[in-house]
Each structure stands twice: as structure tokens, then as C-alpha cells.
């Protein structure tokens, strides 16, 4: 099974299934001499961890990460870093009734068409449980980017259903279970989630992730454009159905005179491009948005077929998130960090000696 690795110089390979013994990943390309402990990774894992609020799945996993290799005396050695998280709260019996049934809106049908079989326990490899390892690997990248280059990566929920959320206060994001930057909308979000729980339904969401302090020059021409790699990374997250960089699809209604980011002696006067021009970072904030579909794991009856092709009605059992966008915030941060780390190392390898007289802001 291919497709388990992302990155060129900073490479992350994950393994494991939702109801397997453990999840793990190998992180290659981490420079030596970086102070690193399990506690450095645990903070973001706790932000993503299931069972931490009444609004998310009640599967209770401690998600305690173990560093198996690549760190000695508290610093990275430059060799492969092995990370492991044990699964401790599997309830595979919740899925025995669907082993011969394809859940609508899930990867059951496509995985069986591709491989001829599937791990039906919680979706197996297709489960978002796999993203715990991305968050752990991303925490390494976030630490390096912040400490060595002053790059800060922050994400938040910017829409749930038909409730838009303004980025009013970044500190507010860590003070509520929704990763919401708009305190005025917390009651509306709570009301929506209560209604969804009562109805047994789910809702979609929009997550925004922003990187500040990114130097100009990251990204490669044509096929490895920085925005293309960011879109690829974010689209690889479970349930993501759309990605925008900067103004995204809003540019359709704009004129060139409105959309271009004019430059004066004081710097850029706007950031409609989301910090990337021609696939290369401009030195402005990198801004990306992703849309997540409403999960299909709901208790509202739905039509599907079984492996014999017979039509059946099913209700999804188990413990699920009514809005998967909530816990996707630290995942989006991690994926953006992984891409930026990779491109920074690639840029340094080729262009470390490049000097220009062009102003930078």
C-alpha cells in the first residue's frame, strides 16, 4: 500500500489502523541538535485527542506518544525519529454488524474495490485516527520552525454549518472546545451541536490555518509550488473536500485591480494571494482554508448495499464526532508545518548562498 509518506527532505511516514495495536510514524530529515522531548509533542496531541469534550467522540484515548529513536540526551541525533502511540480504547464490537455492509459516504466501498478486502473496525487505515501521528510529526516541525526561524503556525475554526466565525482573538481559540476565535458565537455553536446530537446528524466546517514569519523564497517552480504542496497536504486530511489559498474561490468575483497585492516602499498593501506568488512564498502571512464535509457516521437511517449487492438500511453505531472540523484544527497546523519544514530545508540546500538587494518586510 503506497501513499503513506509526505515530504522530500523532511519526510513523514505513518502506519497503523484505528483499531490496531498502535499507531506510529518515522520522521526523517530532522536536523541534529534540536532539544526534543515527548512533552514537546504531547501538547498538540492533547489538543487533537478524542474524548476531551462533550462535542466530540467519546472514544477515550490518552494518545501518549513514545519516542523510540532519533533522540539522545534530550536532543535529536539527525537519524530517523520513530514515534509510537498505543491504541487503548478500541470497541471493535461496535462494527461487527457492518463487516459485510458498506457505510454510505465512507471509504468502505472504495477500499474493498481497490484491495478486495477491508478492515471494517472503525475504518481501519482510512480512519482519522491515523492523523494523531501527523500531529506528532508536525509538532517537531513546528518547534524547529518557531525556534530557528520565528515561524508561528496557528489554526482555528472559521465556520460551522451556516455560522461564520471571525478571527477576533487568537487567545480565545485555546479557551473553548471549538477552537473558535469569536467568543460571541460560542452559544450559537453549542446550540447547533446540541441539536445535531438530538437529531443524530452531523455538520460540516471550515478551518483556517495561518503561518506568520515565513521568509520569502520557499517553494519550487511548476510542480512543487508551495501552494500546490500545501493544498496536497491539507486535502490528504480525512473529510477535507476543498482547499483555498488566500482569497481562494472569492477571486472569481474580483477584478485584477482589486485582487492584486500592490507593493509600496512600506511593503505589500494587501494579501489576497495568501502569502504565495508564483508558487513561492512572498514573506507575507501564508493563509489557507479547508472545508470539511459532515461525517457520514450518523444515526439517521440511510440506504446502502451489502457485499452481495443487496439494498439494506443502516444506522452507524460507535462513537463519532458530530463535527469533524473541530479536532481538525491541530491536524491542519501540523500539515502546514510539515510542508513548510520540507520546503525550508530544500530551499536552504539549494539557495543558502543567494543574496539579493530587494527589500523584505
From Swiss-Prot:
GO cellular component entries: cytosol
Keywords: Amino-acid biosynthesis, Aromatic amino acid biosynthesis, FAD, Flavoprotein, FMN, Lyase, NADP
Highest taxon of source: Bacteria
Annotated InterPro entries: Chorismate_synth, Chorismate_synth_AroC_sf, Chorismate_synthase_CS
CDD domains membership: Chorismate_synthase
Binding-site list for NADP(+): 48, 54
Gene3D superfamilies assigned to the protein according to its UniProt record, in alphabetical order: Chorismate synthase AroC (3.60.150.10)
Molecular function via GO: chorismate synthase activity; FMN binding
Pathway note: Metabolic intermediate biosynthesis; chorismate biosynthesis; chorismate from D-erythrose 4-phosphate and phosphoenolpyruvate: step 7/7
E.C. code: 4.2.3.5
The keyword Electron transport appears for this protein: no
SUPFAM superfamilies listed in its UniProt record: Chorismate synthase, AroC
Cofactor: FMNH2
Single biological process term from Gene Ontology: chorismate biosynthetic process
Classification via Pfam families: Chorismate_synt
Cofactor note: Reduced FMN (FMNH(2)).
Binding site for FMN: 125-127, 238-239, 278, 293-297, 319
Catalysis: reaction(s): 5-O-(1-carboxyvinyl)-3-phosphoshikimate = chorismate + phosphate
Family: Belongs to the chorismate synthase family.
Subunit structure: Homotetramer.
Purpose of the protein: This reaction introduces a second double bond into the aromatic ring system.
Protein name (Swiss-Prot/TrEMBL): Chorismate synthase
Organism: Salmonella arizonae (strain ATCC BAA-731 / CDC346-86 / RSK2980)
Encoding gene, per UniProt annotation: aroC
Amino acid at each position: 500500500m503506497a501513499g503513506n509518506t509526505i515530504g522530500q527532505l523532511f519526510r513523514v511516514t505513518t502506519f497503523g489502523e484505528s483499531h490496531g495495536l498502535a499507531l506510529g510514524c518515522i520522521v526523517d530529515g530532522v536536523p541534529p541538535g534540536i532539544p526534543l522531548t515527548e512533552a514537546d509533542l504531547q501538547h498538540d496531541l492533547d489538543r487533537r485527542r478524542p474524548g476531551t469534550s462533550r462535542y466530540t467522540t467519546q472514544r477515550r484515548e490518552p494518545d501518549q506518544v513514545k519516542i523510540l529513536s532519533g533522540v539522545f540526551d534530550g536532543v535529536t541525533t539527525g537519524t530517523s525519529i520513530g514515534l509510537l502511540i498505543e491504541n487503548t480504547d478500541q470497541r471493535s464490537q461496535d462494527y461487527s454488524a457492518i463487516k459485510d455492509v458498506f457505510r454510505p459516504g465512507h471509504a468502505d466501498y472504495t477500499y474493498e474495490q481497490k484491495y478486495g478486502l477491508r478492515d471494517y473496525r472503525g475504518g481501519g487505515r482510512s480512519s482519522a485516527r491515523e492523523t494523531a501521528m501527523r500531529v506528532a510529526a508536525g509538532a517537531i516541525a513546528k518547534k524547529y520552525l518557531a525556534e530557528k526561524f520565528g515561524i508561528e503556525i496557528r489554526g482555528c475554526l472559521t465556520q460551522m454549518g451556516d455560522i461564520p466565525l471571525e478571527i477576533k482573538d487568537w487567545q480565545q481559540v485555546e479557551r473553548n472546545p471549538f477552537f473558535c476565535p469569536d467568543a460571541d458565537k460560542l452559544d450559537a455553536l453549542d446550540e447547533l451541536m446540541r441539536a445535531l446530537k438530538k437529531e443524530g446528524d452531523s455538520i460540516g466546517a471550515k478551518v483556517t490555518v495561518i503561518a506568520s514569519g515565513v521568509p520569502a523564497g520557499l517553494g519550487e517552480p511548476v510542480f512543487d509550488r508551495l501552494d500546490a504542496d500545501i493544498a496536497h497536504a491539507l486535502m490528504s486530511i480525512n473529510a477535507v473536500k476543498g482547499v483555498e489559498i488566500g482569497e481562494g474561490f472569492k477571486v472569481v468575483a474580483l477584478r485584477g485591480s482589486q485582487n492584486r497585492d500592490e507593493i509600496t516602499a512600506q511593503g505589500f498593501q494587501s494579501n489576497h494571494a495568501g502569502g504565495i506568488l508564483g508558487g513561492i512564498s512572498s514573506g507575507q502571512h501564508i493563509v489557507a482554508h479547508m472545508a470539511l464535509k459532515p461525517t457520514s457516521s450518523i444515526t439517521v437511517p440511510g440506504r446502502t448495499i451489502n457485499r452481495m449487492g443487496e439494498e439494506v438500511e443502516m444506522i452507524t453505531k460507535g462513537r463519532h464526532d458530530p463535527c469533524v472540523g473541530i479536532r481538525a484544527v491541530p491536524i491542519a497546523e501540523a500539515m502546514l508545518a510539515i510542508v513548510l519544514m520540507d520546503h525550508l530545508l530544500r530551499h536552504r540546500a539549494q539557495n543558502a548562498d543567494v543574496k539579493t538587494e530587494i527589500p523584505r518586510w
